[in-house]
């Protein structure tokens, strides 16, 4: 597929509906918007970014491309049609620890804001804050259902109103001195038109709790007092008003409480000898401070060490009980984070894993990594389902499209360093395994066994895997806690291969974030391009009619990607 | 021995307390380099050379050679093979030699420079962490130039001498490579600078294109070196049964041991380069008319992959194997339907090499500019790799590779610039080898050369070696552990216990002064492997130096007389290649000549144009230099082109072409588009059995080679023949346009320009 570097303004996809309907539904996403954030110049105190010596061995601080946190503070329910049928039954995190019982808020419903005003801050961490001169007017006039977007770029952090006419002008822009914000998240539970809780993690390890409407902030893990390595990913714990989880580049997962003060962290483990530390470092999870610890006056609430490797990303399951963590060492670790234990360890085909997400019903986990693959794992069956081949470089973000998922078929998307956006459809019945002598088979006819069979087999599988992991371990006293099942890497010949339904170059620079909205797909890139692609106006059940009604189609029908798209082209 | 004692000073703080160290010349101690700092906790020196970190002197644009040599040295199986083939020089004789060739610096002479350095250090210390933009022109202490200068002034210098006679071989590129490796392995200093002068002499003597002081292509050099090693080794093997062979039976015992313990398919001791670097590509061509699939195997020593902007090595490899349509001017001659037909072709890997050398084709010939351009595409490479493009029947198609070395090209174009190597060492992490300078670097540093960073530095050749998931996981556990925790200690103690690596001879000479802990030296004369290293290669350990009789040339080997150059080399060459080649050439000549000449004419015209275009380049200096070399090379080409088809007796030119065609065969010239018939028209039987194979079996049988392995042996002979027949197709090519064309063009213009 030779494709020019120029990005098209439409995305076409072809979708296999199901077996009954042999045809392919098609659709076109139109580029609605391309917002380009300016990269701020380096802070005067910073060393010049460009070192004249390309071989300079001084380590460069981590940075990341633009990532977005989107929030709508309106009342309208924008949830997709298809979500998990089962109610969230998991108890909230830290339920059993009275030391962490929620303190009844004295101010009633009023949210607590952080202490310090960021605009007047004299902190050496914050360089300056630029607010829009009419920001309060803009806030009052706007449609409450409109989207706010928070975006990091280099050392800047911007607050954008995507529903505004002049959305390129941020409502506020924070410039930090040296640290780059690498990740941020909005607390969905506490958001309102007068309050938004944002947690953001920086390359210095410091975490900022920021409330944009009042422009207040607080600094957590100040100067890395709890964990002094960069924050690679941050998420509010589902159902919690105050607690969020941060992944650090040193392999630690830390739960912080925005209301608590920092304290110098010392591991709370019984056997503290170096030898014991070393032995326990083989475990998939070292609880250096348990959520059940009585000592909860200060941060951290909990601190787990997963590995000596960078944690790339993690994701909470929709049932709020499990956590999928991906690491630079190529492992996907599925945790029961309420019980603080690792259940399963899967490995990438090769190379580090970069991103992870759950299907809306919690049945599947999807990862992307340095093997250029998107991999689907079945959570209940605890096994690999398929490898999705189509990216030409590393995969930076994967996300399900909950508006295009139902009980049988799932739609997800992925973006990567190849500047591409890929869309994938899969339904379990349609996956095929490559047959030994027909690797190029594009027919999607053969089927794999039904779910129940898999489930039975999985038991046997995991039992044998367990034995394998037992034999791997060195004889020491730490066996008792290591209940994690280590799954071997499945050979290529025994794993289903899934082609994308669409593959499209959407920019000139690596794409680092992807989000699905009800009416659009959004991507953001390394150099600050935020693109919005309108969904096809027709529903997913319309097929060809929708196409022909759109004048854009005929001009760029050839723009679609590889794999199944080719055969679809033939059928058109 | 005083010189050896003085080496202790270089070993850093843990050792200088050793009583024997004279306390002289301590004041002008140069600042501890990052490398020395890192090596402070090292235990005793190991015998396998894995803990030696030598820079290499640059004799003016020889960085292409230095970076490749370093990459090869740190391939454990390759180093061991070079050191052990045909036999390992007893350490005593090496030491005797080294006593003369390892030269420690006269610190007093460098006093002044160091004093200056100290002063500057003081000046710099006033502004710690200050950006290097201060206008302090004279000498930037962080600059590589300064570091190299300091290294040259302070580190021990290691010269190599031709030791070929002690290997029982005549001098060749292989023996001088072995000289280099053995010297470093046997050196009593852990760090230093090796001077590959002798190696370069041999290289330049035999290969005209390297004689200029011009910038050379590192990949091309790698390919040439590997081919040359193959040729040298095979040539020696074929002439070994000669009566005047001076080597005692110990050598043959060693070679049987080699074949026995290597445990791989071939008992042929000369095939170790093949076993490491060689893989097999299968090109499957399906005629779209009759749908018949024809297959053809080719061997490769490295893979050259085309690059795309914003892609990964994985993707480049997949593209490499992507289906290609042979149509229009590029049709496929189908045996089945007889005639040129449209066809679909794909290249897949049938046998995976144990070391995968990946050449990223950053220098691309652009039609509109008529010259090579460097591509600054961002191409990411993971630390681990598996190959997607294997055939269905490939053995171990999911083989896991780990990245162990990266050759980086720095510069804006193909005709100038600098090469460095970043290499993962056995247990000291990643190191940057920049000619004389060796510096430890962070693992993340390896990722600075995807091609998108300012500074023009891009990965150019990637070395992946096979590994296992278990080894990877074990290594990952060790990574990023605080070095001051128990891990380092444990490592150290294990090193001291079972890693006491000194062979008897070595131990009694130096142990008293060298080793801080006077523990009883363990008798491990076999090679050590670091515990973290994957079990890469069931490689033959070298014959016990106790059991093997003393080398006949222990002392003589130190400074053997340089043999008269041209004769010696042309003699030992195996006649196999030339003969079969010659015959084949003759047989094919008529058929090929037309196509061949047409192609050549075309190339020449293109080159001519390229040259004309080149003249317009702004860069006057480079242009001038280029012109000179181009002119000479073009002339040489013109001179040689008639030879190409007719003459094959002159040693030098034949050798050269052989390597070239080899390199063509090895993964570059992919397809025999029009000649499937001509190919099948040269059945294997037409070729006489390779003399190489025959002579080898002669050599092996007296040494107790079993008939069974002899059978295997002949199988390989057959394979050789097959490869010989495969050599031809390139001559059949006549101006098709395909994805491989740019490469052959590249090759062409490269040899013209360099």
Curated annotation (Swiss-Prot), chain A:
The keyword Repeat applies. GO terms for cellular component: cell division site; cell tip; nucleus. WD repeats lie at residues 226-266, 306-347, 348-387, 390-434, 506-543. Residues 36-61, 458-486, 541-572 are annotated as: Disordered. Keywords: Repeat, Transcription, Transcription regulation, Ubl conjugation pathway, WD repeat. One of its GO terms (biological process) is carbon catabolite repression of transcription. SMART domains: WD40. Gene3D superfamilies: YVTN repeat-like/Quinoprotein amine dehydrogenase. Residues 549-572 have a biased composition (Low complexity). The keyword Transcription regulation applies. It holds the Pfam family WD40. Component of the regulatory network controlling carbon source utilization through ubiquitination and deubiquitination involving creA, creB, creC, creD and acrB. Required to prevent the proteolysis of the CreB deubiquitinating enzyme in the absence of carbon catabolite repression. CreB deubiquitinating enzyme stabilized in a complex with the CreC leads to the expression of genes such as those in the proline and quinate pathways. Belongs to the WD repeat creC family. Interacts with creB. This is Probable catabolite repression protein creC. It comes from Aspergillus oryzae (strain ATCC 42149 / RIB 40) (Yellow koji mold). The gene is creC.
From Swiss-Prot, chain B:
It catalyses: Thiol-dependent hydrolysis of ester, thioester, amide, peptide and isopeptide bonds formed by the C-terminal Gly of ubiquitin (a 76-residue protein attached to proteins as an intracellular targeting signal). CDD domains: Peptidase_C19G. Its EC number is 3.4.19.12. Residues 236-245, 576-647, 717-732 have a biased composition (Basic and acidic residues). PROSITE patterns: USP_1, USP_2, USP_3. One of its GO terms (cellular component) is nucleus. The active site is at residues 63, 418. One of its GO terms (biological process) is protein deubiquitination. Transmembrane segments: none annotated. Residues 253-269, 692-708 have a biased composition (Polar residues). Residues 546-559 have a biased composition (Low complexity). Residues 1-31, 118-145, 236-269, 494-754 are annotated as: Disordered. Residues 653-665, 733-754 have a biased composition (Basic residues). Residues 580-629 form a coiled coil. One of its GO terms (molecular function) is cysteine-type deubiquitinase activity. It holds the Pfam family UCH. InterPro entries: Papain-like_cys_pep_sf, Peptidase_C19, Peptidase_C19_UCH, USP_CS, USP_dom. Interacts with creA, creC and qutD. Ubiquitin thioesterase component of the regulatory network controlling carbon source utilization through ubiquitination and deubiquitination involving creA, creB, creC, creD and acrB. Deubiquitinates the creA catabolic repressor and the quinate permease qutD. Also plays a role in response to carbon starvation and the control of extracellular proteases activity. PANTHER family: RE52890P, UBIQUITIN CARBOXYL-TERMINAL HYDROLASE. Belongs to the peptidase C19 family. This is Probable ubiquitin carboxyl-terminal hydrolase creB. It comes from Aspergillus oryzae (strain ATCC 42149 / RIB 40).
């Amino acid at each position: 597929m030779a494709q020019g570097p120029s990005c098209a303004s439409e995305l076409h996809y072809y979708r296999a509906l199901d077996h009954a309907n042999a045809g392919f539904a098609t659709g076109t996403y139109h580029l609605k918007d391309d917002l380009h954030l300016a990269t701020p110049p380096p802070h005067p105190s910073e060393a010049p970014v460009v070192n004249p010596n390309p071989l300079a061995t001084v380590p460069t601080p981590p940075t990341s491309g633009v990532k977005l946190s989107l929030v709508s503070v309106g009342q309208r329910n924008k949830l997709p049609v298809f979500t998990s049928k089962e109610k969230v039954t998991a108890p909230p995190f830290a339920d059993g620890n009275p030391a962490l019982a929620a303190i009844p808020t004295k101010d009633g419903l009023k949210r607590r804001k952080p202490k310090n005003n960021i605009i007047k801050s004299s902190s050496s961490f914050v360089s300056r804050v630029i607010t829009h001169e009419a920001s309060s007017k803009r806030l009052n006039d706007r449609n409450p259902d409109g989207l706010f977007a928070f975006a990091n770029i280099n050392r800047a952090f911007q607050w954008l109103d995507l529903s505004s006419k002049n959305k390129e002008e941020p409502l506020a822009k924070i410039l930090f001195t040296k640290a780059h914000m690498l990740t941020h998240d909005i607390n969905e539970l506490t958001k309102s038109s007068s309050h938004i809780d944002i947690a953001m993690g920086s390359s210095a390890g410091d975490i900022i709790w920021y409330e944009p409407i009042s422009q207040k902030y607080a600094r957590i893990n100040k100067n890395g007092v709890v964990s002094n390595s960069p924050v690679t990913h941050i998420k509010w714990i589902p159902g919690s008003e105050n607690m969020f989880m941060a992944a650090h580049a040193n392999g630690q997962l830390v739960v912080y409480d925005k209301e608590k003060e920092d304290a110098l962290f010392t591991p709370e483990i019984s056997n503290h000898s170096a030898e014991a530390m070393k032995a326990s470092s083989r475990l998939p999870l070292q609880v250096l401070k348990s959520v059940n610890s009585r000592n909860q006056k200060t941060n951290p609430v909990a601190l787990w060490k997963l590995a000596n490797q960078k944690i790339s990303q993690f994701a909470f399951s929709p049932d709020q009980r499990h956590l999928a963590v991906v690491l630079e060492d190529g492992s996907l670790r599925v945790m029961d984070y309420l019980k603080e234990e690792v259940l399963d360890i899967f490995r990438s085909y090769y190379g580090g894993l970069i991103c992870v997400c759950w299907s809306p019903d919690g049945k599947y986990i999807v990862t992307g990594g340095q093997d250029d693959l998107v991999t689907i794992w079945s959570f209940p069956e605890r096994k690999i389902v398929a490898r999705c081949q189509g990216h030409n470089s590393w995969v930076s973000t994967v996300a399900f499209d909950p508006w295009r998922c139902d009980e049988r078929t799932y739609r997800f998307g992925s973006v990567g360093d190849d500047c591409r956006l890929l869309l994938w459809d899969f339904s379990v019945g349609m996956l095929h395994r490559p047959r030994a002598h027909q690797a190029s088979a594009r027919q999607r006819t053969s089927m794999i066994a039904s779910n129940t069979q898999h489930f039975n087999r999985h038991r046997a599988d995991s039992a044998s895997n367990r034995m394998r992991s037992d034999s791997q371990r060195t004889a020491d006293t730490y066996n008792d806690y290591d209940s994690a099942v280590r799954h071997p890497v499945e050979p290529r010949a025994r794993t289903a291969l899934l082609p994308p339904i669409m593959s499209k170059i959407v920019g000139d620079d690596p794409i680092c974030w992807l989000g699905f909205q009800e009416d659009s797909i959004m991507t953001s890139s390394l150099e600050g391009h935020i693109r919005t692609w309108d969904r096809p106006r027709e529903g997913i059940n319309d097929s060809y009619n929708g196409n022909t009604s759109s004048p854009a189609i005929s001009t760029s029908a050839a723009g679609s990607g590889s794999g199944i798209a080719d055969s679809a082209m033939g059928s058109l | 021995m005083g010189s050896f004692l003085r080496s202790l000073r270089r070993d850093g703080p843990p050792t200088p307390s050793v009583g024997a160290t004279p306390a002289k010349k301590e004041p002008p101690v140069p600042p501890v380099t990052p490398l020395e700092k890192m090596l402070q906790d090292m235990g005793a020196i190991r015998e396998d050379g894995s803990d030696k970190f030598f820079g290499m002197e640059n004799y003016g644009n020889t960085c292409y050679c230095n970076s490749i040599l370093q990459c090869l040295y740190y391939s454990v199986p390759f180093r061991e093979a070079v050191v052990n083939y045909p036999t390992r020089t007893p350490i005593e004789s090496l030491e005797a030699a080294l006593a003369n060739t390892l030269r420690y610096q006269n610190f007093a002479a460098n006093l002044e420079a160091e004093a200056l350095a100290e002063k500057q250090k003081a000046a710099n210390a006033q502004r710690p962490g200050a950006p290097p933009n201060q206008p302090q022109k004279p000498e930037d202490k962080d600059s590589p130039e300064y570091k190299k200068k300091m290294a040259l002034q302070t580190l021990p210098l290691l010269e190599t001498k031709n030791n070929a006679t002690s290997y029982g071989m005549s001098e060749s590129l292989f023996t001088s490579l072995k000289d280099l490796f053995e010297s470093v392995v046997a050196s009593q200093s852990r760090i230093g600078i090796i001077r590959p002068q002798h190696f370069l002499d041999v290289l330049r003597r035999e290969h005209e294109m390297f004689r200029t002081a011009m910038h050379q292509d590192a990949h091309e050099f790698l390919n040439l070196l590997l081919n040359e090693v193959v040729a040298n080794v095979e040539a020696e093997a074929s002439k070994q049964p000669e009566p005047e062979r001076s080597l005692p039976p110990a050598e043959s015992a060693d070679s049987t041991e080699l074949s026995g313990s290597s445990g791989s398919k071939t008992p042929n001791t000369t095939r170790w380069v093949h076993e490491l670097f060689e893989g097999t590509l299968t090109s499957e061509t399906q005629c779209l008319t009759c749908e018949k699939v024809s297959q053809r195997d080719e061997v490769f020593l490295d893979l050259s992959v085309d690059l795309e902007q914003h892609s990964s090595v994985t993707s480049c490899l997949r593209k490499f194997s992507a289906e290609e349509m042979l149509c229009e001017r590029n049709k496929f001659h189908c045996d089945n339907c007889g005639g040129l037909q449209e066809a679909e072709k794909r290249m897949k890997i049938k046998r995976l090499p144990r070391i995968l050398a990946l050449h990223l084709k950053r220098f691309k010939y652009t039609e509109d500019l008529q010259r090579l351009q460097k591509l600054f595409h961002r191409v990411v490479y993971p630390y681990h790799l598996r190959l997607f493009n294997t055939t269905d029947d490939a053995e171990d198609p999911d083989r896991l590779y780990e990245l162990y070395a990266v050759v980086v090209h720095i510069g804006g174009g193909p005709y100038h610039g600098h090469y460095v190597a970043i290499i993962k060492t056995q247990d000291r992490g990643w190191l940057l080898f920049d000619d004389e300078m060796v510096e430890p670097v962070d693992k993340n540093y390896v990722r600075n050369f995807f091609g998108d960073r300012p500074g023009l530095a891009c990965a150019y050749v990637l070395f992946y070696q096979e590994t296992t998931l278990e080894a990877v996981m074990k290594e990952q556990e060790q990574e990023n552990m605080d070095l001051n925790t128990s891990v380092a200690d444990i490592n150290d103690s294990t090193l001291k216990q079972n890693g006491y690596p000194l062979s008897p001879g070595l131990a009694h000479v130096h142990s008293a002064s060298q080793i801080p802990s006077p523990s009883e030296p363990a008798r491990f004369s076999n090679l050590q492997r670091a515990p973290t290293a994957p079990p890469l290669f069931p490689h033959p350990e070298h014959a016990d130096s106790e059991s093997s009789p003393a080398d006949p040339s222990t002392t003589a080997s130190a400074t053997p007389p340089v043999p008269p150059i041209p004769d010696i080399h042309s003699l030992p060459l195996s006649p196999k290649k030339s003969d079969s080649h010659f015959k084949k050439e003759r047989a094919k000549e008529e058929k090929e000549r037309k196509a061949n000449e047409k192609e050549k004419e075309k190339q020449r015209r293109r080159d001519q144009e390229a040259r004309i275009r080149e003249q317009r380049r702004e860069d006057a200096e480079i242009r001038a230099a280029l012109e000179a070399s181009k002119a000479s090379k073009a002339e040489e080409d013109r001179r040689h082109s008639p030879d190409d088809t007719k003459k094959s007796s002159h040693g030098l030119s034949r050798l050269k072409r052989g390597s070239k065609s080899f390199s063509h065969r090895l993964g570059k010239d992919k397809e025999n588009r029009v000649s499937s018939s001509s190919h099948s028209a040269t059945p294997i039987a037409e070729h006489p059995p390779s003399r190489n194979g025959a002579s080898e079996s002669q050599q092996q049988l007296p040494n107790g080679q079993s008939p069974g392995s002899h059978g295997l042996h002949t199988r390989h002979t057959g394979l050789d023949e097959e490869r010989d027949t495969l050599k031809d197709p390139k001559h059949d090519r006549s101006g098709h346009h395909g994805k491989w064309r740019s490469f052959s063009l590249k090759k062409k213009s490269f040899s013209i320009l360099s």
